[in-house]
């Protein structure tokens, strides 16, 4: 959840994990700039073998129920599961929320680096994501000492560059 004076944003994913396999049920985005509502809801229908989006992006696509398809939020959970399991190279079928198409994303551990968070140095796994259909590259800094938490994500492409960094670790007791 993120807020500022002009907008608030909430992203949610409802899913199940069974023996390391994620099954997405729904993905929700709530973006509320003061002047426009840009919500989007995505629902997986396992009986009808369809994924449907309503709201900002409207589409409906058929899918193979035997294929693990992940949304952008639970893909991070799957990355952690794979790294904890010792995988250094893997792929994830990622749902493109704008179109409903499913794109295979390839991941590979490329090394280690020290990342400083809250004045503490953490040895991080450097994980590189490759998307073969576009000119984007994403580098993840993941700290095994923090239960494989994402500390920094750098996404570079021809149209935009983004860096996300962890600001605070919350404790729920």
Question: Which residues fall in each region the model found?
Answer:
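Acidic, serine/threonine-rich low-complexity disordered tracts
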Residues: 1-43, 86-173
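Hydrophobic, well-structured mid-protein blocks that either form specific transmembrane helices
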Residues: 36-82
């Amino acid at each position: 959840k993120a807020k500022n004076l002009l907008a608030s944003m909430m992203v949610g994913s409802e899913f199940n994990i069974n023996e390391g396999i994620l099954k997405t049920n729904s993905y929700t985005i709530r973006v509320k700039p003061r002047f426009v509502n840009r919500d989007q809801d995505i629902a997986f229908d396992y009986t009808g073998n369809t994924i449907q989006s309503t709201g900002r992006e409207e589409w409906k696509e058929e899918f193979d129920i035997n294929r693990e398809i992940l949304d952008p939020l639970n893909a991070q959970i799957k990355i952690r599961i794979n790294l904890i399991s010792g995988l250094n190279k893997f792929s994830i079928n990622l749902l493109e929320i704008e179109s409903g198409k499913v794109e295979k994303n390839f991941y590979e551990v490329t090394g280690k680096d020290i990342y400083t968070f809250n004045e503490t140095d953490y040895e991080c796994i450097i994980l590189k994501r490759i998307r073969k259909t576009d000119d984007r590259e994403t580098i993840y800094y993941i700290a095994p000492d923090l239960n494989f938490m994402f500390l920094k994500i750098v996404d570079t492409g021809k149209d935009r560059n983004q860096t996300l960094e962890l600001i605070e670790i919350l404790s729920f007791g």
